[in-house]
Amino acid sequence: MKLEFTEKNYNSFVLQNLNKQRKRKEYWDIALTVDHHVFFAHRNVLAAVSPLVKNLISNHDMKTTDELFITIDPNYLSPTTVDQLLDYFYSGKVVISEQNVEELLRGAQYFNTPRLRIHCNDFLIKSIRRANCLRYLFLAELFELKEVSDLAYSGIRDNFHYWASPEGCVHFMRCPPVIFGRLLRDENLHVLNEDQALNALINWVCFRKDEREKYFKKFFNYINLNAVSNKTLMYASNKLMGMENSSAHSTLIESVLVDRKQERPTSLLSYQRKGALLDSVVILGGQKAHGKFNDGVFAYIIQENLWLKLSEMPYRAAALSATSAGRYIYISGGTTEQISGLKTAWRYDMDDNSWTKLPDLPIGLVFHTMVTCGGTVYSVGGSIAPRRYVSNIYRYDERKETWCLAGKMSIPMDGTAVITRGDRNLYIVTGRCLVKGYISRVGVVDCFDTNTGEVVQCITFPIEFNHRPLLSFHQDNILCVYSHRQSVEINLQKVKANKTTTSVPLLPNNCPLDVSHAICSVGDNKVFVCGGVTTTTDVQTKDYTINPNAYLLDQKAGEWKTLAPPPEALDCPACCLAKLPCKILQRI
């Protein structure tokens, strides 16, 4: 009789014991020295996973009793990384992070271990984001990782307006010439305008003038001077005086300026590259007159006082929410004829004019508030049914492709006003909830830390209004809350609220702001409002109509301006500020 017995996980058992022997320095026959640190191992194990070690053994005709010594340059691989590599060779497990991925790639290159290189490549692809795409592009070029290179380049191109800004240029000035030239040549480069592209070129050259001045002539040809403002052209002309062989460029600039003096003033918009960004307010969904739900997506181009239809949503809904993050607009939730709280979520690509279905929200929501903080999308509060509010704050995890519970507000609310500060904190200001059986807006400010998932500060204040307030930061610690009846300055450091005389005037139609309006801060103390319901002058009839107009509030002057009317009058649409590429004008 014969019986075969097989040990479970025997290979793992053997390697685990070999690794223990390695750490106890038992039966070793190979030593790796890095900056006075010596690591002992077994030739057979390393030869099985590393062609480098295998070739060293075979090329030197080593005997079984011989010992192999390898010295590694500490400037190439640190002792910590070598120790981590040996653990990987023995266990097949490795923890990769943004901090160690570069050295692990060097280790994979040094020991010629393609599987580790694949793991590093996968990590870079899954963890790429705006803040690290420049560094990842450097790594991709250095280690010839094409897929990572393409993704990182797209990330820089799509966020060039950030990298060329004062906030991002500190790191971007180190961009190699081959990458910088490729970016400037790209017609789809996301710049604020051609002025920013020209300024970026000048700053990049001046950062290392002796090394980069030779590239200026070639890269200058990638700038469309007809799309640059007179002010920036004159600034560039002055900068060129300090550069060698720049007379031809100065002549081109002067020619454009002279031609403009002889012609009628025209908009520079038609000359911008396809990727130049337009500050816009995007309106999505909503409910039309007579109760019909809408699926249209409209954009108001602020600079041109112009409305465009961008697309149609994959579903019809009102009381949904939206936020923009780079080239994408995220939408979720809402109500329809059949369902009062939808779980559905979608992402709209403004560049490609395409929609991608996202995983559903954990619960169906209406009147929730979507916001982007640190490049991550959040959903704050909301209602799951009439008079049933939630305190949940959800975060969309791009890597795991799922909605996660990030934390909770201090009380359940919907219709909240949210403002961000930095890449970490959400300030959730007032919201609707049940107070003694009645729907009421409460005066509360929650500072939600997205890193810890906790409300780290909660401030209450007396409230005399029932609409979503307008928010802004004055100085670092002063949060301003504006409404029709009262305005409050909240000192976050001293935890103190003071009333101010500033207030928000009624809309031009003499109606107050309402949760049904699309409200969006567009910067420079200006606020966009459209849609929503308005009451008739005869209060006794209690008739409501949908506001057909759009308005812009100048908070400094305290005045409303009537804008071009929206294509449709909509109640409870979603609204967000977005940067649309100029090619949308050509597409439409």
From Swiss-Prot:
Q: What is a single Pfam family found in this protein's UniProt entry? A: BACK
> Residue positions of the PTM Phosphoserine?
149
Q: Which UniProt keywords apply?
A: Cytoplasm, Cytoskeleton, Developmental protein, Differentiation, Kelch repeat, Phosphoprotein, Repeat, Spermatogenesis
Q: Which residues form the BTB domain?
A: 28-98
- Subcellular location, record wording: Cytoplasm, Cytoskeleton, Perinuclear theca, Calyx
Q: Which GO terms describe its biological process?
A: cell differentiation; proteasome-mediated ubiquitin-dependent protein catabolic process; spermatogenesis
Q: Which SMART domains match?
A: BACK, BTB, Kelch
PROSITE patterns assigned: BTB
On the tree of life, the source organism's domain of life is Eukaryota
In terms of InterPro entries, this protein maps to:
BACK (IPR011705), BTB-kelch_protein (IPR017096), BTB/POZ_dom (IPR000210), Calicin_BTB_POZ (IPR048070), Kelch-typ_b-propeller (IPR015915), Kelch_1 (IPR006652), SKP1/BTB/POZ_sf (IPR011333)
The UniProt GO MF terms for this protein read: ubiquitin-like ligase-substrate adaptor activity
Q: Which GO terms describe its cellular component?
A: Cul3-RING ubiquitin ligase complex; cytoplasm; cytoskeletal calyx; cytoskeleton
Name where the Kelch repeats lie: 280-327, 328-375, 377-423, 425-475, 476-525, 526-580
Q: Does the keyword Repeat apply?
A: yes
SUPFAM superfamilies per record: Kelch motif (SSF117281), POZ domain (SSF54695)
What assembly does the database describe for this protein? Interacts with CYLC1; the interaction may be relevant for proper acrosome attachment to the nuclear envelope.
Q: What does this protein do?
A: Required for both nuclear and acrosomal shaping during spermiogenesis.
Protein name in the entry: Calicin
Q: Which organism is it from?
A: Bos taurus (Bovine)
